[in-house]
Amino acid sequence: MEEDCEFRHWDELIPDALGLIFSHLPLQEVLTVVPRVCKAWNRAVTGPYCWQEIDIELWSNRFHQSDHLDRMLEMLIPRSAGSLRKLSVTGLRNDSIFSFIAQHAGSLKTLKVPRSGLTNSGVVNVAEKLSSLTFLDLSYCCKIGPEAIQAIGKHCKSLREFCRNMHPLDVASVVSHDDEAYAIANTMPKLKRLEIAYHRVSTEGVLKILSCCVFLEFLELRGCWDVQLDNKFFKEKFPDMKVLGPRVIGFYDMINDWEDCCSDYFSDGSDYLAWEFFEDGVMGEFYEDEFEHGWDDNFYAENAVLDMEPHIWPPSP
């Protein structure tokens, strides 16, 4: 005797469920494979459920400072329909595309834009539109300084994590970053995590941050060679603080037996931790001649080396 069972077809899943599933697929497949399966999947891909979190950091590394990157963002971000919560991208070309992001940042909580060509004026002009941010990464953005940081701190009152790491070569000619340290201390009192690796910051600058950011739980000072903090004083004053950086030993336990596993990273006889697309149009319905305005698969073949293994969709139950 056959049991009566109800099966739900893949194309009948609710859009938010489809969006959650598709968000775990590689970007290329979401844009070139999924829309061709059926109309329901194509609608899900062009709707907001797939794009509440946009992580194209790896993809953007291939098109650093490129108009391809601008076009990708201009296509994907509006699909979120104002529900964008997280954006990870590297190498924004200029303030214009950053302003475009800010225009759609009403729900944005996490923003990662390292290695971008942003300027002080560009950040100042849009900082108030980023007020919902809790996490911001402006690492390796060499054209901004204390003015931009102060604007972020002034308008982003919910900011809890701030990354402002630099590359040693980018700061070789910089005399001091204390002005940035003071901007952070004076405008970001609720920070819980701060990364300022390889900043030319002084001991006074770091102490100013520590005295003002009383909720700080993690501080990265890797490569901040001018900072000298007394180990005993630090243990007594900030017993729960985790610090990664020179002249502060024993506050960062990433794994068990860290020193044994990574002894090569410690300088002998010192207190340092020494470590060093697409098409012009928007994807439309993939049916008959309507696909002539769709995604151009050759964009990937001509411009990047990507994993092109065939994707086999499971049959509908």
From Swiss-Prot:
One protein family per Pfam: F-box-like
Keywords: Nucleus, Ubl conjugation pathway
Pathway: Protein modification; protein ubiquitination
Protein location: Nucleus
Gene3D superfamilies: 1.20.1280.50, Ribonuclease Inhibitor
Single Gene Ontology BP annotation: post-transcriptional regulation of gene expression
GO cellular component: nucleus
Matches recorded under InterPro entries: F-box_dom (IPR001810), Leu-rich_rpt (IPR001611), LRR_dom_sf (IPR032675)
Superkingdom of the source species: Eukaryota
Main localization of the protein described in the UniProt heading: nucleus
F-box domain location: 7-54
The protein's assembly and partners: Part of a SCF (SKP1-cullin-F-box) protein ligase complex. Interacts with CUL1, CUL2 and SPK1B/ASK2.
UniProt function note: Component of SCF(ASK-cullin-F-box) E3 ubiquitin ligase complexes, which may mediate the ubiquitination and subsequent proteasomal degradation of target proteins.
Entry comment, domain topic: The F-box is necessary for the interaction with ASK proteins.
Protein name: F-box protein FBW2
Source organism (scientific name): Arabidopsis thaliana (Mouse-ear cress)
